[in-house]
């Protein structure tokens, strides 16, 4: 499953590279993004005892209200990760810049193609049974178990696939308000 985790990160890196029109900027962004996400995953698990899930973004306002009550301690691992991330970013800053497109028209076409590719990937992600094909079984009652078994990236995407907020079939506002009309 390590290769599958790396594959997901690689695909995300390609999308970011196409949108930013630069491998160097994309790699800098991805390094900072993954460091920040590792902090989110760490602190959510530390404070709540449960893994961070995509659905948690819906309750971000509540999290912002209660975050002041927690004590954030910076561990040696966090410091080491931060220093490593900054060294990698520094290496990327010294690397040669490579752009996929130089003219404005080509940049726009590149981003439209990247958006179409992302849409196609999202539709495949949601509608194909990719997780069963790779043997990934999502434990929706205990996402942390899924993360531990298959890796954080694959576990997060597998659990997020089933965490969509969709209304039940046949349910509408009219059906809900009908039983309450006589009262």
For each feature predicted by the language model, list its residue ranges.
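Single conserved hydrophobic/aromatic residue that forms the stacking wall/gate
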Residues: 174-183
């Amino acid at each position: 499953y390590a290769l599958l985790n790396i594959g997901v990160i690689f695909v995300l890196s390609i999308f970011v590279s196409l949108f930013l029109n630069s491998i160097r900027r994309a790699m800098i962004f991805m390094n900072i993004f993954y460091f920040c996400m590792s902090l989110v995953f760490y602190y959510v698990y530390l404070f709540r005892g449960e893994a961070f899930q995509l659905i948690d973004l819906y309750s971000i306002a509540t999290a912002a209200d209660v975050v002041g009550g927690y004590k954030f301690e910076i561990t040696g691992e966090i410091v080491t990760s931060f220093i490593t991330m900054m060294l990698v970013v520094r290496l990327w800053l010294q690397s040669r810049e490579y752009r996929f497109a130089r003219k404005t028209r080509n940049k726009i076409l590149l981003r439209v193609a990247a958006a179409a590719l992302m849409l196609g990937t999202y539709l495949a992600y949601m509608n194909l049974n990719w997780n069963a094909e790779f043997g990934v079984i999502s434990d929706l009652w205990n996402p942390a178990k899924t993360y531990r078994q298959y890796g954080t990236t694959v576990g997060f995407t597998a659990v997020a696939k089933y965490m969509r907020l969709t209304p039940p079939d046949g349910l509408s506002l009219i059906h809900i308000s009908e039983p309450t009309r006589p009262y």
